[in-house]
């Protein structure tokens, strides 16, 4: 993991006021690389606000501590969890992970979620992030391996950030449309406002949004299989 001095320098050079946001972004880059090296991304596709910022929007994107994914193979719920637990069970390039398996990992009828604390020598209190894998539906469109937008700190990393299998752009946005229609959170509206100024396939987005809303309604009507 980068030293706290390096993180401070990166924050100063980028004009960031909050060093914690810079630190968190670096931590998320490490976790994405870890999941890539452990083969987890062969079964899940990156999506959500952090995906949009890291792969599409760059610095204009919204800050988030979440890494959101969706399952894209026939791997079971429990197998996904075991792969993630195994990956976070050991230190990775100076980054350690603290969590209570019984409290910080949980299933709903739609997803697997976890809240590990990521620690390193410069921050023993750690940074808490959220991991979530949607289990309710597989991608409509094929996932594509997308490169992360180059950051100045990439040259300081002990690895070259890998391209990460991600949902197609219009499919990510269609899930934002669905989320905005269901919960109207500022984060979704922020992401959609950034989308509005960019080129995209409107007909495809409209069709995907209808499918996502239909799938969501079907999931709500379905009994919770874990009760």
Question: Each PLM stretch: what is its role?
Answer:
Residues 46-51:
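Glycine-rich beta-strand-to-loop/alpha-helix junction loops that act as flexible
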Residues 1-44, 55-67, 71-227:
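Structured mid-to-C-terminal alpha-helical surface segments
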